[in-house]
């Protein structure tokens, strides 16, 4: 993967939430492509415990909250995969779109939509300054710029797969 920030987003929107096995297979196939800058996985969260109500503090044993392996990197999937945003270098976009469509047809058990555009922030935001402080630009990976939540721990929300 490249560490450049001049990229175009490709949003893959399956018509159903993906199971961990399907998400793992799809992510591994996407990461095989050249010119991928970053991949974001979005969807409803799968909590590890009940956070409110009478059962507060009780552990949630959800079968979809489990570890998956992408490019040899194992991490816990904390969301039901509802959309995947792939950041690609502009020069590789046109030639890779057909390959992405073939991968999606092969891996996804449902229909899907693909959108091309700008779906993520690529410039430094106020939230980045709140999270990292002043003069952080040279100290962090440019792929994480614009992806932070100032109140969360980065190790809980971002997995860096190389």
Curated annotation (Swiss-Prot):
Assigned keywords, A-Z: Methanogenesis
Gene: mrtD
Pfam families: MCR_D (PF02505)
NCBIfam families tied to this protein: met_CoM_red_D
Protein name as catalogued: Methyl-coenzyme M reductase II operon protein D
Complexes and interactors: MCR is composed of three subunits: alpha, beta, and gamma. The function of protein D is not known.
Presence of the UniProt keyword Ribosomal protein in the record: no
One GO biological process term: methanogenesis
Domain of life the protein comes from: Archaea
InterPro entries linked to this entry: Me_CoM_Rdtase_D
